[in-house]
């Protein structure tokens, strides 16, 4: 009886472990992620300017990312795992006439979201994540996003 109970427990643990592994492989795919903070300088708060709040977002589906920089659409081909996002090709539309906080967010995002850029992805929970630039720098730039 005890052996049967242990076998059932082991089988359930392996099944649940397999499910947990599948959940981790999605990375940021499937949700629309709103950019809520940009951390590029340790001496500067990362919050977005009031006139730019809610204007920048990104969505990843398969090997494609569609984003809005606050001023212009951005499209990229990506490679991803649950812990890494790498941009392969990036196209950004013209942002002429964009000013103020939205322009600041646009300029910051387009300086980070470049071909070859890689980010460590850290999901804080199902609705919040950070994308931190992969580099040897001590204070690596990062993008904080919230799922809509």
Model-derived regions, located:
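Lipid interaction determinants
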Residues: 2-9, 19-148
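C-terminal segment of classical bacterial N-terminal signal peptides
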Residues: 14-18
């Amino acid at each position: 009886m005890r052996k049967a109970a242990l076998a059932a427990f082991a089988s359930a643990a392996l099944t649940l472990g397999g499910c947990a592994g599948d959940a981790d492989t999605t990375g940021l795919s499937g949700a629309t992620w709103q950019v809520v903070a940009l951390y590029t300088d340790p001496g500067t708060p990362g919050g977005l300017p009031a006139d730019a709040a809610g204007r920048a977002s990104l969505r990843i589906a398969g090997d494609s990312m569609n984003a809005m920089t606050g001023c212009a659409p951005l499209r990229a081909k990506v490679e991803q795992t649950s812990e890494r996002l790498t941009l392969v090709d990036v196209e950004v539309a013209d942002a002429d006439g964009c000013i103020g906080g939205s322009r600041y967010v646009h300029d910051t995002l387009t300086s980070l979201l470049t071909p070859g850029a890689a980010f460590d992805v850290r999901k804080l929970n199902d609705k919040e994540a950070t994308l931190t630039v992969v580099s040897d720098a001590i204070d690596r730039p990062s993008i904080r996003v919230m799922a809509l």
